[in-house]
Swiss-Prot record:
Alphabetized InterPro entries for the sequence: Ribosomal_bL27, Ribosomal_bL27_CS
GO MF assignments: structural constituent of ribosome
Keyword Ribosomal protein appears in the UniProt entry: yes
Gene Ontology terms: biological process: translation
Listed SUPFAM superfamilies: Ribosomal L27 protein-like
UniProt xrefs under Pfam families: Ribosomal_L27
Example of a GO cellular component annotation carried by this entry: ribonucleoprotein complex
Family: Belongs to the bacterial ribosomal protein bL27 family.
Keyword tags: Ribonucleoprotein, Ribosomal protein
Source organism of this protein record: Chlorobium luteolum (strain DSM 273 / BCRC 81028 / 2530)
Span list, region Disordered: 1-21
Name of the protein: Large ribosomal subunit protein bL27
Length: 84
């Protein structure tokens, strides 16, 4: 019989790398064409006027202008770029 219990391994001890999601350019800020406005998982916020969407659902600016957030159809948030 064992005098001490075996030192078993733990099931914890892992951590995933940060993904740096979220808004990168706030509403009212000036952006140039190609600037990333927000990174997200899925289309939580949809692109509106003068905004494009990438393969990973990243929303970016298509023109130079000012970022505005608004509620679009079905109360879904949208990002627009007002050209400057």
């Amino acid at each position: 019989m064992a005098h001490k219990k075996g030192g078993g391994s733990t099931k914890n001890g892992r951590d995933s790398n940060p993904k740096y999601l979220g808004v990168k350019a706030a509403g009212g800020s000036t952006v140039s064409a190609g600037t990333i406005i927000l990174r997200q998982r899925g289309t939580v916020i949809k692109p509106g006027t003068n905004a494009g969407i990438g393969r990973d659902h990243t929303i970016f600016s298509l023109v130079d202008g000012v970022v505005t957030f608004r509620n679009g159809r079905n109360n879904k948030k949208q990002v627009d770029i007002l050209p400057s």
